[in-house]
Design a protein with these regions (language model features):
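Ferredoxin-type iron-sulfur electron-transfer modules in oxidoreductases and energy-metabolism complexes
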Residues: 2-24, 40-72, 83-85, 90-123, ...
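Iron-sulfur cluster-binding cysteine motifs and their immediate structural context
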Residues: 83-87, 487-493, 581-600, 611-624
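Flexible inter-domain linker/hinge segments
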Residues: 122-188, 342, 348-363
């Protein structure tokens, strides 16, 4: 256990020497995606082969440095998820993609023993080999601050976190700054909450610090519920100590002695890594009573949620931690006044807390130098959808959407045309190619009718039906509605019913205007922020793709030929040989005709399964 500041400084220096002594390191991505692809088997095989070669393999960082050892580590997410499982070789910085256990022998023989690049495992594009991670276009335009440690250290080791300067910000906050100075530093940095609306974190901390209550709480929102979003999960898995350090600093600044991390149970790896980090921090005297001999107490507990989307809302989240049903309540009072257990509470999300140690260590002015003035810093995004390179990216606020999608993401998969990007999850909106040069910051997106939200970016190509996209998100929101307020409970249900009729070819004149009217009512009268933003995907798709809605309603036609019930399958008489094969495979008997004469489809019976299209050898059956 570290008893004082000197102990912490000595431990950090000792572990740094031990880490520097590992002249060769193998970092196996052990994020959820790569683990699913076999990363743990790769890690075990690398250890076995190194030991078999006679070299000294070091899995856990020792207290004392040892020369000539090869460090083999399970790191956090590297971000290039499309190419996993990933293995990074240091000190060269080589990144190997799509690694399998059978590749390990060549990696050891050539890269560790022979110090040569295994070219077949390196990333290739445009007839060029990109040996190092830093050279790969996916990484080249990123600025990784929050994700800086992910992929570079053992995510389960407090020793490695200390070795790279970990808990230096906590040390500074404990010994060199007053509570007011910490709050002022966060205020001056203009760090805005990374979980949704972008409320200034420093302002929230100041409000809680001014409360006279003897009991206060720090709560981290790790309930990442947006479809396709995995930024917070990756931070919790890859750099848990960084997030814990941010929470500890918030506790010192606001006078809180207890913190909670609310994380969904569907994130078992994140929960496991957090539990390990908390135990380690307690063992080292960085959590608990009398931290580093200062007389300050602060401890953290984990509360696992059951996956309800509405529990991402502040008052619903605190209710869930208390053991109640997760339902939003009327405000005021707000969480800064009466939050968890009716006490003043700082509630920020994972990425917000992960920014704090760097701000305290390097200063508010440094932080404001990254990104635009009103939205400084970086933002992590989960890049998914019809894009060449899906994964986790981090860019400075204000980076144009085009740069993220085309320069980092590699553009649209298969050479198709870009159509839209859904940003902000179910509470966000769809942006079009006219918005590609829009800077990704809170204010610019709000003006465009969207929001950053937690940071999900779902890219859609020209074959995507925007009416179906709106129906998908409305179905999600309606299913996740807590049902407490009528506007959200009933309004989203009516909107979903209208959208389902439209994609089924049963749309009526006036449906589009009714959707907009319902959207306005729900947005202006719903109880919580989730209800107020529930209609954003519908409003933005109508605004930007009204012609698609009109085609569905007025012409009973889906322009992208995506909506199953709007498909029309026909038989071209000039191509039909009358072989009857299509009629024989039709499961509902919708095709009839005479042998050696053109057959015909009864549109009323046809279920659009497409079996006849696959069966026809003459390509006479096709979608109209």
């Amino acid at each position: 256990m570290l008893l004082n500041r000197d102990d912490l400084i000595k431990a950090r220096a000792g572990y740094k020497k031990a880490l520097d002594a590992q002249k060769k390191k193998i970092l196996v991505c052990a994020g959820t995606g790569c683990v699913a692809g076999g990363a743990l088997e790769i890690h075990a095989e690398l250890i076995r082969l190194i030991e078999a070669s006679g070299a000294v393999c070091q899995v856990s960082l020792e207290k004392e440095p040892h020369s000539g050892v090869v460090g083999v580590k399970k790191s956090g997410c590297h971000g290039f998820c499309e190419m996993g499982p990933l293995v990074r070789i240091e000190p060269q910085g080589w990144l190997y993609i799509k690694v399998q256990p059978q590749d390990c022998a060549q990696i050891i023989e050539e890269s560790i023993l022979g110090e040569r690049l295994v070219e077949r495992l390196a990333y290739k594009a445009d007839d060029r080999i990109y040996p190092t991670q830093e050279e790969i276009p996916f990484y080249k335009k990123q600025t990784r601050l929050v994700l800086d440690h992910c992929g570079h250290i053992d995510a389960t080791s407090i020793r490695e976190y200390l070795a790279i300067g970990g808990y230096a910000a906590l040390e500074k906050a404990l010994f060199d700054m007053s509570a007011d100075e910490i709050v002022k530093e966060i205020e001056e940095s203009n760090l805005r909450g990374r979980g949704g609306g972008g409320y200034p974190a420093g302002r929230k901390w100041a409000q809680v610090s001014r409360q006279k209550s003897p009991v206060k709480y720090i709560v981290c929102n790790g309930d990442e519920g947006d479809p396709g979003a995995f930024m917070d999960r990756s931070v919790m898995e890859g750099d848990p100590h960084g997030m814990l350090e941010g929470m500890m600093i918030a506790g010192i600044a606001c006078g809180a002695s207890e913190g909670y991390i609310y994380v969904r149970a569907e994130y078992p790896l994140a929960v496991s890594r957090l539990e390990t980090a908390i135990v380690q921090a307690r063992e080292y005297g960085l959590l608990g009573r009398n931290i580093l001999g200062t007389g300050r107490d602060f401890d953290i507990k984990i509360s696992k949620g059951a996956g309800a989307f509405v529990c991402g809302e502040g008052s619903a989240l605190t209710a869930s931690i208390e053991g109640k049903r997760g339902m939003p309540r009327v405000k005021p009072p707000r969480t800064v006044e009466q939050g968890l257990f009716a006490k003043p509470t700082v509630l920020n999300n994972v990425e917000t807390f992960a920014n704090v140690p760097q701000i305290i260590r390097k200063g508010a002015a440094w932080y404001r130098s990254v990104g635009p003035e009103k939205s400084p810093g970086t933002k992590a995004f989960a890049l998914t959808g019809n894009i060449e390179h899906t994964g986790l990216v981090e860019v400075p606020m204000g980076t144009p959407l085009r740069e993220v999608i085309f320069d980092i993401g590699g553009g649209i998969r298969g050479g198709a045309g870009f159509k839209a990007v859904q940003i902000g999850g179910p509470s966000g909106g769809c942006l079009t190619k006219e918005h590609l040069d829009l800077p990704l910051d809170f204010d610019s997106l709000k003006k465009a009718g969207a929001m950053i939200g937690s940071g999900g970016l779902v890219v859609m190509d020209e074959h995507t039906c925007m009416v179906e996209v709106a129906r998908f998100f409305m179905n999600f929101t309606q299913n996740e509605s807590c049902g407490k307020c009528v506007p959200c409970r009933e309004g989203t249900k009516r909107m979903r019913e209208i959208l389902e009729r439209i994609v089924a070819g049963q749309g009526e004149a006036g449906d589009i205007d009714m959707l907009l009217e319902l959207a306005d009512t729900v947005s202006s009268t719903a109880l919580c922020g989730l209800g107020k933003t529930a209609a954003f995907p519908v409003v933005s798709t109508i605004k930007n793709f009204r012609d698609e809605y009109e085609a569905h309603v007025m012409e009973k036609r889906c322009p992208t030929k995506t909506c199953q019930k709007l498909k029309q399958i026909i038989i071209e008489p000039g191509l039909c040989r009358g072989c009857s094969k299509c009629a024989r495979v039709c499961p509902v008997g919708a095709i009839a005709g005479k042998i050696k004469e053109p057959f015909a489809i009864d549109a009323a019976k046809c279920i659009k399964c497409g079996a006849c299209i696959e069966a026809c050898a003459f390509k006479a059956v096709k979608e109209d």
